[in-house]
Swiss-Prot record:
Domain of life: Eukaryota
Residue ranges, compositional bias (Low complexity): 423-456
Similarity comment: family membership: Belongs to the WD repeat coronin family.
Gene: Coro7
Name of the molecule in the record: Coronin-7
Residue numbers bearing the Phosphothreonine modification: 874
PTM entry text: The membrane-associated form is phosphorylated on tyrosine residues. Ubiquitinated via 'Lys-33'-linked ubiquitin chains by the BCR(KLHL20) E3 ubiquitin ligase complex: 'Lys-33'-linked ubiquitination promotes interaction with EPS15 and facilitates actin polymerization at the trans-Golgi network, thereby facilitating post-Golgi trafficking. Deubiquitinated by ZRANB1/TRABID.
Organism taxonomic ancestry: Eukaryota, Metazoa, Chordata, Craniata, Vertebrata
Gene source species: Rattus norvegicus (Rat)
Amino acid sequence: MNRFKASKFRHMEARPSRREAWISDIRAGTTATCGNHIKSSCSLIAFNSDRPGVLGIISLEGHEENKRHVTYLGCHSDLVTDLDFSPFDDFLLASGSADRTIKLWRLSSTGEALPSVPGVVLGPEELPVDVLQFHPTADGVLVSTAGRTVKVWDVAKQQHLTELEAHKDLVQSAVWSRDGATVGTACKDKQLRIFDPRARAQASQSTQAHENNRDIRLAWTGIQEYLVSTGFNQMREREAKLWDTRVFSSALASITLDTSPGSLIPLLDPDSGLLVLAGKGENQLYCYEVTPQQPALSPVTQCILENALRGAALVPRQALAVMNCEVLQVLQLSDTAIIPISHRVPRKAVEFHEDLFPDTAGSVPASDAHTWWAGDNQQVQKVSLNPAHRPHPRFTSSLLPTLEPSPNMEQPAELPRADTELSEGFSSPSSLVSPSTPSSLGLSLSSTSGIGTSPSQRSLQSLLGPSSKFRHAEGTILHRDSHITNLKGLNLTTPGESDGFCANRLRVAVPLLSSGGQVAVLELQKPGRLPDTALPTLQNGAAVMDLVWDPFDPHRLAVAGEDARIRLWRVPPGGLKNVLTTPETVLTGHTEKIYSLRFHPLAADVLASSSYDLTIRIWDLQAGTEQLRLQGHQDQIFSLAWSPDGKQLATVCKDGRVRVYDPRSSPLPLQDGPGPEGGRGARIVWVCNGGCLLVSGFDSRSERQLQLYMADALAEGPSALLGLDVAPSTLLPSYDPDTGLVLLTGKGDTRVFLYEVIPEAPFFLECNSFTSPDPHKGFILLPKTECDIQDVEFARCLRLRQTSLEPVAFRLPRVRKEFFQDDVFPDTAVTWASALDAKAWFKGANGQPRLLSLQPPGMTPVSQAPREVPARRTPSSAQYLEEKSDQQKKEELLNAMVAKLGNREDPLPQDSFEGVDEDEWD
């Protein structure tokens, strides 16, 4: 702005809209990421919800008198760190996450029928994705950052075109210049860098940006050579700087605001040159005009906000109310609402003002990824914002197919919002088969009511592949009244082969750090704060290696010691009252310390143990003797598991092999196959009714992964492999045979993965993962009978913290909870009653578990519930009146008034009055 020429924006006013225009009743969530937490296209708004991995989607404009409803898109299994709409396709959304992937989503025009699987998956990266942005001129080009890495992606080919030179620290911002030729980055090493990604991977220019390395953001102006950065100076004051890339050694201009700790979000409109600075956690917006002349950063206006700002976004210029002289609209994301803030220049005439609204870039891309990478520099054709020159041609990207539901298609019920608390964790689903083979899937609709799907839905599902009915599962830490607190002296260094603690429906056994291998036994029916005095314990006499409850006797506990002995303890029915020093039975036979213990799933008094002597021994507890000894392992045995029918035993070993034994027929393995490459630890569990084996372990790069084997074809290797993340602890699987769900988490993790495992492709169906507020030391699945069936609780677990024990409930949102959800709760096996005794099993007999219905008395199965008839929607009065002419409205109004008055023949009130007599007139 020339100092001798008044700015056309000098009288601009910024005002929050009326409450009627707010998008309320939302629950926004923010994290310490480089993103703005909210983005807008000309049609839709997307924002971070309070559930990790879940985005809220809502229409930008309300329709008639209808209230806008937020729908939720389950994007990732961890926090969404950044998101962006395509500048050309209003319904193409990209999301980046802490789960190290970038996903592209095709949204519907209404924003209601949301996809359950992404259209494209990019990655995974080595670190969480921090920033992403679509290219401003070419369709299908995306820039992203992850840690110190910056990549430019060809979305159509699902591969990166180039990886820019590694930065020296975390990349905090990456933005395209308006012509799409260069990329500007801001790094935690305080450097600004300019890249020409098509020329070379090294930076063409660099300079020091701000003296403080905290949260530097960038925004490119409408003039190619100018760049705005925001950050903090050495005095921790917030500041903004304007840079001329032709003279990049120092800033062209700078302004200092205040010492507030909230990071500045720069929102710059390249057409008008208006810069809005929004501070996270604050209630004020600053607006400046950016010009190449001095003063280069001129204050225009400020706006006081009613609520604290959690995120902010600009509405595209093509969606502005230009006839009202609205030159900017900022969407403020608060904790409970999205508030439009309109910036208007007062003008007397209600007309289109060309000086306020120059032509802007249209919605048709100038090129695609291939032509742009080949050197094409065509610019997007500009269009007028004058309403008289609209509509402009719209563009639909071919990157993802457009799948709109037919008008008569049943829409999935909106996911009810859970009454979540701060202690809850919720992460959303996506269907990944393998990180190395990203899926290219579109919209997938499935019923969440438990009643069934329409033929059109089934045909769509057959086209796009299956999705889990548990994908919207919600994990909740139950109320504090059910917690056991004030735990002290826990042994948090149990071997990796042990779960760290064990539980049944009555009590929990937790090893303590004190000498002598002490084990505390806590009653689940007596929650609350434990006394500060010492608890009565089991004096094992040797350090505890593993411990497990007898599934058929809730009072018997087996404890494996470092002295190669197995001790069987009997806990009194009311719990421990005194210290127990003498076990019921001591089993001796192993020559080295023991890895793990596993009870037989059907036969009473049968126990398997693995040891450092590289053998597995099977014990008859009734006789107190070793009956079988399995051999063939060449190294440490990581894990063992009984098959559901109790006939076979599977192991995974440090020698990189998975083995299956038939213990009663041979001490050598029946078959074996290749196992995980990493030697840090592994677990094995039978899934899919015993038809498959699931192994969790590490690959050669120490990435945690899942491998699924066909139980009768181990030699062929895994049928499916799924990489998860990089973490030091082994994933401990807890499998629920009724639902086919496996819960996976490690000691010291804060996240529990949920997958539905099926025996055919895609094998793993990802569901919402559970995120806890702090790391847990163990995670145990309780028997199905502990679940609240009426609340559609399909799993209940115990979470061990350093000082407390917390129950966690996993529920499935259902609309008609008054019915028994028989599709979620099939008859369950009676795991607490044996099918045969040890003597019969060792002689070759087999048994079958009894089945128990979980249907509560008086509840009707949802499969037998009457179908709900959808209410017929009648047009609103406003819509009805709009369809009539003025003359018709006038006639109807007069008729209504006449009808109200009516032609009544009733006597008038004065007719009943009595007059005076005739003689009184005289």
